[in-house]
Amino acid sequence: MSDDYELKELQPPEGANCNYNINTPQYENNNNNNNNTSGNESPNILNSENQFNQVANELENDSKQFFSNQDPEMNVEHSNVAQNEQDFKLRSYFENSQRIALGNGQKPKKMGISIRNLTVVGKGADISVISDLSTPFVTIFNLFRPSTWRKSSGSTFDILHDVTLFNRDAEMLLVLGRPGAGCSTLLRVISNQRSSYVSVSGDVTYGGINSDEWKNFKGESIYTPEEDTHHPTLTVRETLNFALKCKTIHNRLPDEKKKTFRKKIYDLLVGMFGISKQSDTLVGNEFIRGLSGGERKRLTITEAMVSSASITCYDCSTRGLDAASALDYAKSIRIMSDTLHKTTIASFYQASDSIFNLFNNVAILEKGRLIYFGPVGLAKQYFLDLGFDCEPRKSTPDFLTGVTNPQERKVRPGFEGRAPETSSDFEKAWKSSDLYQVMLQQQLEYEKKIELEQPSTNFIEQIRNENSKTNPTKSIYTTSYFTQVRALIARNSQIIWGDRFALISKYISIIVQTFVYASLFYNMKSDVTGLFNRGGAIYAAILFNAFVSAGELGLTFYGRRILQKQHSYAMYRPSALHIAMVITDIPLTAIQVTIFSVIVYFMYGLQVDAGKFFIFLFTIFGSTLSMVAFFRALGNLSPSLYVSQNILNVFILFMFTYGGYSIPKNKMHPWFSWYFWINPFSFPYKALMANEFGDMNFTCNDQTAIPNGNYIASNGSTMSYQDQYRACPSAGAIEGQMVNGEFYVAGSNYIDAALDFKSDDRTLNVIITFLWWIFFVIINMIALELFDWTSGGMPHKVYKRGKAPKINDDEEERQQNAMVENATSKMKDTLKMRESCFTWNHIHYTVQLNGKDLLLLNDVEGWIKPGQMTALMGSSGAGKTTLLDVLAKRKTMGTVTGKCLLNGKELNIDFERITGYVEQMDVHNPGLTVREALRFSAKLRQEPTVSLQDKYEYVEQVLEMMEMKHLGDALIGSLETGIGISVEERKRLTIGIELVAKPHILFLDEPTSGLDSQSSYNIVKFIRKLADAGMPLVCTIHQPSSVLFEYFDRILLLAKGGKTVYYGDIGEKSKTLTSYFERNGVRSCTESENPAEYILEAIGAGTNPGVSTIDWPEVWKQSPELQDVQAELASLETAATVQISSDDQDHGPPREFATSIWYQTWEVYKRLNLIWWRDMSYVYGIFTQAAASGLIIGFTFWNLDLSSSDMNQRVFFIFEILFLGILYIFIAIPQFLIQKAYFKKDYASKFYSWCPFAISIVIVELPFVAVAGTICFFCSFWTAGIYYNGEYDFYFYITFILFLFICVSLGQVVSAFCFNVMLAQTILPLLLVMLFLFCGVLVPYEQIPNFWKFVYHSNPCRYFLEGVVTSVLKNVFVDCSNEDLTKFSNPTNLTCKEYFKPTYGNVRAVTKGDESECGYCVFKSGEEYYKTLGWSYENRLRNYGILWAFFIFNIIMVVSFVYLTKKPNR
């Protein structure tokens, strides 16, 4: 092949202010569009000035975007436009703005890019394997195996290999390639996002600035990913106005106000992208209704344009847009690139020729290698000359990427064996071409021009001029820190108000829980019997407000991706975001705390004193703020939510235990006592205890004071105890202390003696509480500035250990292509389709909307036969998916009428099982491999008479046929985590899961939705293979290319309202279809036109929607084609033309499920157990929590002795063990909800019934929970010195494990009942309040209000505590320590025992020191202690049985709720 090129200079149209006068190579070939040009003919060069003029004129004439309300500050002399004049064209606006800016001293930032020898190295597939619970042990074992040391780092591969290209300012570069070609990586590297790769070598310069120095200009080269990441509760206006506030430049036009400038730009951009009408619509997401997917994509693009970056990289930014919107978007960035000298690099999904021709150059990648870089006008001819052929009506971008696909490319006669086959072949051909040398010369000249003109000098100067004058000289931010904070405060307020329903729900939940708290401690006694309760009530108030703030942890991770994106756009400093959040927290927290405090303070019966009330309010306010900041700090310092939750659980346990309530400060062991001094709970607790107890006296009557009654003097006379030697039975009591004839304990003495708190420290503790808040705020600011936990790399696959495929060399690549061809040729023998015919007639579907019937399908009929591929098309809202749902029996709401017949017979209960339904969303369990998912489908959906070996062999055949053999042992994973298979591979897997079931018919809903052109082609071609193998199928498809449309045999076209427009054959080159419309009054369809777009346009549903003057449904009703359809339907329904095979008859009567309930349960359990086994973060998370909780609790209550205070400590030891169970309630909920979503999808296809799932998911948790409980038991039980004898210890152990089972199953009950996590989080807090507060420890049974006593009797925590506490304290004799004694003077010459004997007996009086002072010990045994709680040792076996009843009841509830919610609402 000989390629002759020359350089010609292109001149822009007269008057166009664009930088298009670049040296661009063009072919000198008048027949450059001729697909049959011989490879020996030398291409010549076309002068493309006419082509450019045509594009420029089209942009000028077709631009429908207008700028209204022209600001008076614009230079009217130049624009000749009045103030309120409209119809101001987009290009004219930009050109006018640019002229005015130049007159004002502003110059465009002309920053192109130049890349030489760029190689990006990524991690190979073997560098990470599928992790499971054995992974840590394997890792440790490998440390002692020298043979594994070298391999530990894993292999690497080149994501990009030796890429050299450039792009001038004001030019647009299109990057094309198949999935995995490296397009996204190239765009990321150009945007200077390199952290996720092993290494990046080569030179990348930005207007002469190298990549290291370019880091100082964050926001000047941005990467816009294909995902749309926005705050869902903001409107379009709020989202863009915020971006504009952060990016409003300083050097605006003279006297131009910021607000005017922002409004002008906003109106321009929303008009440009057609989202003006959606300005006040919420952005929304999958849970919040808002913008459509296409509208959200346009918002993403608009936000990127607001950033005003010099270099912008758009990665598949047209995904989800229709053809018209994509073209408008491309035109807009073309104009902006021309007029504002912006450098644009973009990769597109399914780019049309119209979009393609807007770009200057195109770079084509294949497996990381650059196989073409040059002008768009030369690309097609280049590959034609290499020996490839382009099909008629195939777009140029599809052709360019198609040549890299062995299944798609077509080699012209005479080039067999000569045309490139592998990626390296293509790269060699490119580097040996003359055009490659021309482009190298162009790049060299561009670099010399950069060196001569030094655009970086002007670039740096313009950045300084644009930035706020209050910013530091080297600041990368446009606006000042104060402006950023102010904008963020406004945005945070809008986010909260946008989701005001959640805010109101939160306050309602708080009010309800507050009344529960307050009613439990209602009107507490002010005597000594209420001392402990009063302290508990105050501590509960602190805990409640702290844990209400725990939701901030999840919100921190939710907003992380948005922060990363906007920070990469240099909109604001991350620390400014936190300052703004803190400021918006203050009023919201004040409302929350005020509501809580007003209710609680007065219902508690705390001192009615204004000063004390406001100190209470102020302290709770500071404590809540500090905990909000603490939870955020934990999130900002953690790489993932799982990590932060595990750390949080440890902290919560520490904070609760070492707050000074459950363990007094003087009882804390030295190894953990230090935490008391850094505990955010301890300081507000000390402050509030001092506030309440500091000047309050707690009385006791004569009967309660000790000693009371009489004693026998040494002379034998009976004497009364003297008041000056009596006191209240409480810590801090002073003998003889009385007021108004009653003994009392001063509150200040009590908190000093019992808790070691000083009432004088109240003010200091309040101040420290707020200092904690400030400390955590600073930590958050530092963390946000220093850490970026978001991953920016490409998703990667992980395989089973030792199963990762090798990186193919050229020979292996050729062999793999040959294997695919061989598998394809054998497809018909592999599939062995049952020939079935499915018909539907007079289908109507009605739903209720606002009390009225809404008809969504109106008299639809049709059929699918073996070997036929039927397309289902129509405008948006025509009912395509609705019809498929009805035909596949997936509708659970509404009313369906009409007849659906399979082989001329009514549908049986096995219809869903024998029918394959490929839904639009690819829902797969991420914890399985591809092969495991396919085998699971085959085992449960194929007939039980088929052997397991045959099922597995069939799976392998389908894997090979789907070209996924190398992915069999790859983890499915998820796109969100960046680990797993690609989008296209997921779509293939979705189809494969239906195929291995050997379905009779196949329904496919939008199988190409969201895929690039090559993936779409591969999917449709694969579906065609299924049809050729005898599979009857129907497939909805949205605006297919002309090439894809040719694969279909028949089409069912629907209009809005679910009415039939046409049903029949498409015909060769779509002649049958187009002739129907032409004959009924529509213009002729040209040879070059896409028939799919033609028919949609004809019925007013094309990419440019219009109003058709023809009533097409009525035309269809009067057409002879309808009569033919009805006649054929009648024939099919009466004749049953396709007979049921003898194999089917042998299977017996129809069954809803192919296998027995026991087999289903076993298989579902095995799958769930495998998923749990691989979920290291979940399982090791619960193990870690168990070990950490056990060690913390065990060493906190280290080696408890037999004093009376340690009796209380033993109870609190067991009470804190409950924390692990409560924790597992939280942990079980998200795991259950995730698996429940997969169950609903499986149940719809009749994999298995609801009962196997419910039973299996309960059982699968139990072994892991039992191990966790065992770990906690061994870490805590003997450490605390609780052991007494084997019988009691064993009872403790088995009861504890059973209690954990109850907690996990209780979490599953909540999950089975709830539809989502948000509802579960609303229910949980109230549930946990009931479990914790009404268990009989914090508030004894006698002190619980009568209204709430039913909760105590229905609380599993009560039965666990009663059984375990009585076992632990049984036969324990109390030996009071000196600190536990209530001491009295002995005014007699009697011994202490003699002095107390008449009233208390010998065992109750303990002498300490000499006989002049006696000590009184409250309890003589553990049994006496637990009887004060109303518990009995005799109830322990009963309690154990009741706990089993709770567990069984929970299982029944799980099964019941799963049954009731087994079908999604659709």
UniProtKB/Swiss-Prot annotation:
It is found in: Membrane. It comes from the Eukaryota. CDD domains: ABCG_PDR_domain1, ABCG_PDR_domain2. Residues 23-45 have a biased composition (Low complexity). One of its GO terms (biological process) is aggregation involved in sorocarp development. ATP binds at residues 874-881. This is ABC transporter G family member 10. PANTHER family: ATP-BINDING CASSETTE TRANSPORTER (PTHR19241).
